Design a protein with these regions (language model features):
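Alpha-helical membrane-interface segments at transmembrane helix boundaries
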Residues: 70-74
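Membrane-embedded multi-pass helical conduit in multi-pass membrane proteins
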Residues: 75-151
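Membrane-proximal intrinsically disordered regions of secretory-pathway and membrane-system proteins
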Residues: 11-13, 154-158
Length: 158
């Protein structure tokens, strides 16, 4: 609803505003499994809206088309871009690109270490890498599961 209703309002040519006095509550997840479930559900809802409303992708049909693409769609391409960046930099013979490949491998190694051990996650850098990789991995899973019809969109409190 927090996406569907504003998009219908925008489609009618009206402005969508958030009242600065609004109160928004979102409980922090204590564990990654709860966050993963929440992320799968919310991204699944995005994919469901995209499938229901093809006009969202039309520059003529969507008055906020550029904002929609940049805030909703391009973010979903990030996990795939990460995979492409890693593979292409690993295959490159250019020196500076190989340095970027080494940095990417170090980043993913840090994330892997954080996934394996709570002790490692005490480091802010490793914690950041871990959460960044896990959330992007979850975004990729959401897209693949939705495309294959295996994504459970049933709401449950996480």
């Amino acid at each position: 609803d927090d996406f569907e209703i504003p998009m219908q309002i925008a489609r009618q040519g009206q402005r969508v505003l958030l009242d600065g006095r609004s109160l928004v509550f979102d409980e922090l997840q204590n564990d990654m499994s709860g966050e993963r479930k929440r992320k799968l559900r919310t991204l699944g809802g995005n994919f469901q809206s995209f499938a229901r409303h093809p006009w969202l992708f039309s520059p003529r049909g969507n008055p906020i088309w550029l904002q929609f693409l940049s805030h909703k769609v391009f973010r979903l391409a990030v996990p795939y871009a990460m995979v492409c960046a890693l593979i292409s930099s690993l295959l490159s013979s250019t020196g500076w690109v190989q340095c970027l490949a080494a940095a990417q491998v170090a980043f993913y190694t840090a994330a892997w270490m954080g996934m394996r051990s709570p002790t490692w996650r005490k480091s802010r850098l490793i914690a950041f890498a871990t959460v960044f990789v896990e959330l992007n991995w979850t975004a990729m899973q959401a897209g693949l599961q939705f495309a294959s019809g295996r994504l459970d969109l049933q709401w449950e409190k996480t």
